[in-house]
Design a protein with these regions (language model features):
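Short, Lys/Arg-rich flexible segments
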Residues: 1-93, 110, 114, 118-164
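Cofactor-/ligand-binding subdomain signature composed of acidic, glycine-rich
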Residues: 106
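Membrane-proximal amphipathic alpha-helices
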Residues: 87, 95-98, 102
Length: 164
């Protein structure tokens, strides 16, 4: 199931994660694996995350409030790690010329993804949809099975190489 980790206030970034059953045990064992195995797992994880980022960027182009995603989309990036990771947000400023204090991508992520309009200060965002989201989370939910399958395949491929 997809979930959001808390906003990192130091770097203004949000992490999106997919949880898989049995990952904790695997990651514990991976810490003691040879460095070639760790490197291969990290590269495979980044490849999977890159595919998800491409899908998110495509979906962000067709949503009806795509102007808000123009600031967020360049900050979407895959991060190398033992599991597929995607970072969102950052300090890149929105391209609005009339405001003294322009919002950063990290400040727009949650409003553009989940909506607003319940408070006076969130009228610029689309209608609030609860946990559904508009671009990021629907993409993760749709690709959840693919992510799990590809990650499992990557791990099996690495373990087959080690067993030789």
């Amino acid at each position: 199931m997809a979930r959001v980790r808390p906003l990192d206030t130091r770097t203004n970034q949000t992490r999106v994660a997919v949880e898989m059953f049995g990952m904790d045990e695997f990651l514990r064992e991976l810490r003691f694996a040879p460095s070639e195995v760790k490197k291969a797992v990290k590269q495979g994880s980044k490849e999977i995350a890159d595919k998800v980022v491409v899908e998110m960027k495509q979906r962000a182009r067709i949503v009806w409030h795509q102007e808000q995603y123009e600031t967020i989309v360049p900050s979407l990036r895959a991060v190398q790690g033992t599991v597929p990771k995607i970072k969102i947000g950052g300090a890149r400023k929105a391209a609005v010329g009339r405001r003294k204090r322009r919002p950063s991508a990290g400040e727009l992520v949650m409003g553009a993804e989940f909506g607003g309009r319940r408070e006076e200060t969130t009228q610029q965002f689309p209608i609030h949809r609860g946990r559904k989201g508009y671009v990021l989370f629907p993409t993760i939910r749709r690709l959840h099975g693919t992510i799990k399958k590809e990650y499992t395949d990557q791990i099996e491929k690495v373990l087959r190489k080690v067993a030789r």
